């Protein structure tokens, strides 16, 4: 009996062992910090990874269909994800809370435009918050605030939502049916800009003035909703036939009529220069209309550097250079340009100025002025070097003091063409005093004679070229006094060692303007450049004992002052 009982127990244990399922086929356990996969789905694999990393892993439906086999270690999850992405065609993103896995075919893209936040600020926000991923950079133009993003769907949605929230302005203040909106401008001025041009006061209207002028006369009641008058009632038929219905013109719906007249009515616009903002008061539709209008007008402008050269040359020297306004200019075998039949041309400015500098060393040319102006496209730049004389106007009972201003004035209004060339609206006024200096019989109250030369034109300059304007001739009288050193200053007899000479010549004045778009950051200032040169040459060494002593001495002086 005992033998039968023992045999039954042994058979029962053997049956239990045979029925119990094995973990090696259906549920492969995690061994240490790794995972052994055998034709498993990616969802199973990433569930095991989530268990080890203690981070949730979300796998899309398309990615979960793929199978994986192999022995994997989780000690470097980033490298493992990169390797799997290349081999299985996956894309992934980690936002600090969860890991998102997608199939490569699920990649999305979007184009976002920023108005109130620059692209650099938005990139810095993503980096500070830990949301930025170097595998999916934002590509765009910092000046215009428009960028392109491509990557996993969750990353693209996050970037678009974050950009929308950061760029979103205040919705305004609701006052019943009225609304007040605040619109901040980033690329233009909200108020008018005023500057003096000789005796004229020039005004460049701002955004507020431009919109007010646009809406002048729009304060009108709601227009007729029906597009035309209804037709007259048709006559009844005498024989009992049914008359046709009148063709009534289809009118607009009330909603369409209200939308069409939303821009009209009483809109209040105020410029606030402190923050360069525009305050708008009106209905919600009116405020939205002004907001869209401001968005279209407030665009970034490109910077333009204008280098001006005013050069006086002797007519004979200019002819020897080979300059002919109706032919060509040739300087050796380095410079050759063709000129049109007027007093304007484009040329390589650096080579022309090099030739002028060579003549200046021989005192055969004079660089009168060489200012450099920085402006923006569609913004005027003005250089004005003038002189003013005053004269009395005496009447029977009234006395007035009037003035006359003359000199050199250059006004340039640059803009960019579609092919990247710089087009300039150019106005030049060159005036000088033509009163003979040797005329000693002229009374004190006599008015001087002023000569003016005016040039007004529009020219387009290719990239890297300069604009040469002028070529007009004027007479120049120069008086030169030379003496023997020391002897020429002796009293009484000093005049014996001095001699004077008078020279009359024909001087040709030319204006060269070199426009250049500023794309890179501005160059460092002079002190920084000198310090860099000293460091590179070894003249500035941190091991120099004298410099260390001076630095310590100056630091002590600063501490004593504190």
Curated annotation (Swiss-Prot):
Q: Which residues form the signal peptide?
A: 1-24
Q: Which of UniProt's keywords are assigned here?
A: Cell outer membrane, Membrane, Protein transport, Signal, Translocation, Transport, Virulence
Please state the gene responsible for encoding this protein: sctC1
Disulfide linkage: none
The cellular component terms of Gene Ontology attached to this UniProt record, alphabetical and capped at eight, are: cell outer membrane; type II protein secretion system complex; type III protein secretion system complex
Name the UniProt record assigns to this protein: SPI-1 type 3 secretion system secretin
Q: Which HAMAP family match?
A: Type_III_secretin
Effect of a null allele: Insertion mutants are hypoinvasive in the HEp-2 cell assay.
Q: PANTHER family of this UniProt entry?
A: PROBABLE GENERAL SECRETION PATHWAY PROTEIN D, SPI-1 TYPE 3 SECRETION SYSTEM SECRETIN
Assembly behavior = The core secretion machinery of the T3SS is composed of approximately 20 different proteins, including cytoplasmic components, a base, an export apparatus and a needle. This subunit is part of the base, which anchors the injectisome in the bacterial cell envelope. Forms a stable homooligomeric complex. The complex is composed of 15 subunits.
Instruction: Give the primary localization class.
Output: membrane
Instruction: Give the function comment from the record.
Output: Component of the type III secretion system (T3SS), also called injectisome, which is used to inject bacterial effector proteins into eukaryotic host cells. Forms a ring-shaped multimeric structure with an apparent central pore in the outer membrane.
- Subcellular localization(s) per the UniProt record: Cell outer membrane
Q: Which family does it belong to?
A: Belongs to the bacterial secretin family. T3SS SctC subfamily.
Query: Superkingdom of the source?
Result: Bacteria
